[in-house]
């Protein structure tokens, strides 16, 4: 009987394929900012937003100019970090970098659409920076209409360190806002799901109807509004007027020297 030795090859190759799938993602780096610094272009800002997908709450955009000599250790795409890690890095970023935040309310999102509202907030965040940047990196496909050069980077929050820092600031700020909204709108669980369309949120919508903080263009919200008609529309309170984050400096911040390479 002749054995086919090639039949064993897939088994030998299998561990290699598994290793490729389990490989850790490359962390965001400061290389693009460093390249601009070498060309004499500074300050350089990164900006990103949080909250494009939820059924409720605002879109929060952040812009960050990192200090090349004081970069906190551990900055990365906010989606790769735990809530605890994001909170700690938020404080360190605000203590060492120039930071600004802008918020697009649900009313603006309904009026302008989610893309335009997001771009509006991103531009306002850049304009609100304490120092005007000479170059801006923005996450996504769309460049901003800024006074300086703007470079859109797809997946930028996992590539460009300044964008990653902005993603952390935007995410933490929005999460805190949603926890505050939970106090005004009990029963919806905003503090848990942050406005996303999880089953618990959809159930609350069906039982209680939408609030002024829900985005009407989403089908579940529109359906809940129709069910609970006639709907008494309360005056919309602009809870999101602030465009800048107040920062509190920390005495000691761990610096990531490797990020400066």
From Swiss-Prot:
Q: Which gene encodes it?
A: rnhB
- What biological process terms from GO does the record include? DNA replication, removal of RNA primer; mismatch repair
Where does this protein reside within or beyond the cell? Cytoplasm
> Its biological function?
Endonuclease that specifically degrades the RNA of RNA-DNA hybrids.
Instruction: Please tell me whether the keyword Nucleus is annotated for this protein.
Output: no
The entry's family comment says: Belongs to the RNase HII family.
Q: What positions does the entry give for a divalent metal cation binding?
A: 48-49, 139
**HAMAP family reported for this sequence:** RNase_HII_B
Could you tell me which residue ranges the RNase H type-2 domain spans? Answer: 42-230
Q: This chain belongs to which protein, by name?
A: Ribonuclease HII
Biased composition, Basic and acidic residues: where in the chain?
A: 1-20
Q: Where is the segment annotated Disordered?
A: 1-23
Q: Entry cofactor note text? A: Manganese or magnesium. Binds 1 divalent metal ion per monomer in the absence of substrate. May bind a second metal ion after substrate binding.
The record's SUPFAM superfamilies line, in alphabetical order, gives: Ribonuclease H-like
């Amino acid at each position: 009987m002749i054995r086919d030795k090639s039949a064993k090859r897939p088994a030998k190759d299998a561990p290699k394929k598994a290793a490729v799938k389990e490989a850790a993602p490359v962390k965001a780096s400061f290389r693009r900012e460093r390249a601009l610094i070498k060309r004499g272009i500074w300050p350089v800002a990164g900006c990103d937003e949080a909250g494009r997908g939820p059924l409720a709450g605002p879109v929060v955009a952040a812009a960050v100019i990192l200090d090349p000599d004081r970069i906190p250790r551990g900055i990365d795409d906010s989606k790769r970090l735990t809530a605890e890690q994001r909170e700690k890095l938020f404080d360190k970023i605000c203590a060492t970098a120039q930071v600004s935040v802008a918020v697009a309310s649900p009313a603006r999102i309904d009026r302008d659409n989610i893309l335009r509202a997001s771009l509006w907030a991103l531009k306002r965040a850049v304009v609100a920076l304490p120092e005007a940047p000479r170059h801006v990196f923005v996450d996504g496909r769309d460049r901003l209409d800024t006074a300086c050069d703007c470079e859109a980077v797809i997946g930028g929050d996992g590539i460009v360190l300044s964008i990653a820092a902005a993603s952390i600031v935007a995410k933490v700020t929005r999460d805190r806002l949603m926890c505050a909204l939970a106090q005004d709108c009990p029963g919806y669980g905003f503090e848990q799901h942050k406005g996303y369309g999880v089953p618990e949120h959809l159930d609350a919508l069906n039982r209680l109807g939408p609030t002024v903080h829900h985005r009407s263009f989403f089908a579940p919200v529109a359906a809940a509004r129709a069910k609970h008609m006639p709907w008494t529309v309360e005056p919309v309170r602009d809870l999101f007027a602030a465009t800048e984050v107040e920062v509190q400096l920390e005495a000691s911040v761990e610096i990531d020297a490797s990020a400066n390479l």
